[in-house]
């Protein structure tokens, strides 16, 4: 399952659960779980709403991290295999 792929990252970050990287990591896990759930249950609109809320939170955290520390942002993006933010 998805949880098993990120165990090493989670063990590494267990002492710093409040860090931006750990929060983005946990939101990414939730997003992947909800996405697989919604593939089976297409009409679960409350889960769709929750997914959109989590996506927004992760997007705001990634924007913050990209402004504060671009190197850590790039490493996190590559490690979690997610796309970069769209810039205006």
Swiss-Prot record:
Predominant cellular place of this UniProt entry's protein: plastid
**Which SUPFAM superfamilies does the record associate with it?**
S15/NS1 RNA-binding domain (SSF47060)
- Keyword Metal-binding belongs to the record: no
Classify the source by domain of life: Eukaryota
In which family does this protein belong, per the annotation? Belongs to the universal ribosomal protein uS15 family.
Xref: Gene3D superfamilies: S15/NS1, RNA-binding
Q: Which organism is it from?
A: Capsella bursa-pastoris (Shepherd's purse)
Question: Which SMART domains does the annotation name?
Answer: Ribosomal_S15
The molecule here is called: Small ribosomal subunit protein uS15c
GO BP, one example? translation
| Keyword Cell membrane carried by entry | no
The record's keywords, sorted A to Z, are: Chloroplast, Plastid, Ribonucleoprotein, Ribosomal protein
Q: Which Pfam families match?
A: Ribosomal_S15
Give the subcellular location. Plastid, Chloroplast
Show the GO cellular component annotation of the record.
chloroplast; ribonucleoprotein complex; ribosome
Task: Describe its partners and assembly state.
Answer: Part of the 30S ribosomal subunit.
InterPro entries assigned:
Ribosomal_uS15, Ribosomal_uS15_bac-type, uS15_NS1_RNA-bd_sf
Gene Ontology molecular-function annotations:
structural constituent of ribosome
């Amino acid at each position: 399952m998805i949880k098993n792929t990120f165990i090493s990252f989670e063990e590494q970050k267990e002492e710093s659960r409040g860090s931006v990287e750990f929060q983005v990591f946990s939101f990414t896990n939730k997003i992947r779980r909800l996405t697989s759930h919604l593939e089976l249950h297409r009409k679960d609109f409350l889960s769709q709403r929750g997914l959109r809320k989590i996506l927004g939170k992760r997007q705001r955290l990634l924007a913050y991290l990209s402004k504060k520390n671009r190197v850590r942002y790039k490493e996190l993006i590559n490690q979690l295999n997610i796309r970069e933010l769209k810039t205006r």
